[in-house]
């Protein structure tokens, strides 16, 4: 399923919440490598949780955060026009509210 993306390409929406997109200026090879590493550490979180290994979980979560910053999904925004960041905010409470309200209703999985 493709999630709706804001007209400016900065966010996608899941269950009414805005999530910052990956920086589109990243070279494809770099984006692929970072995404691969991100998936590895997300899986490591799951393994650590199942093993009840708090230290491994903490390390994996730190790596996920680091990689999401590198991808532009967290940390400083990747756009340069001075617009504020609405990451993780409900779309209805942001300047994207009108756009969001006009989206067709999608069935959630």
Give the residues covered by each predicted segment:
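Extended, charge-rich alpha-helical interface modules
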Residues: 1-109
């Amino acid at each position: 399923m493709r999630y709706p993306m804001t007209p400016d390409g900065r966010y996608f929406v899941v269950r009414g919440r805005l999530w910052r997109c990956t920086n589109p200026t990243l070279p494809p090879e770099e984006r692929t490598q970072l995404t691969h590493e991100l998936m590895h550490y997300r899986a490591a979180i799951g393994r650590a949780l199942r093993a009840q290994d708090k230290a491994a979980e903490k390390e994996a979560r730190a790596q996920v955060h680091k990689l999401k910053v590198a991808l532009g999904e967290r940390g400083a925004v990747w756009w340069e026009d001075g617009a504020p960041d609405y990451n993780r905010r409900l779309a209805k409470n942001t300047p994207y509210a009108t756009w969001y309200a006009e989206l067709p209703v999608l069935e959630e999985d």
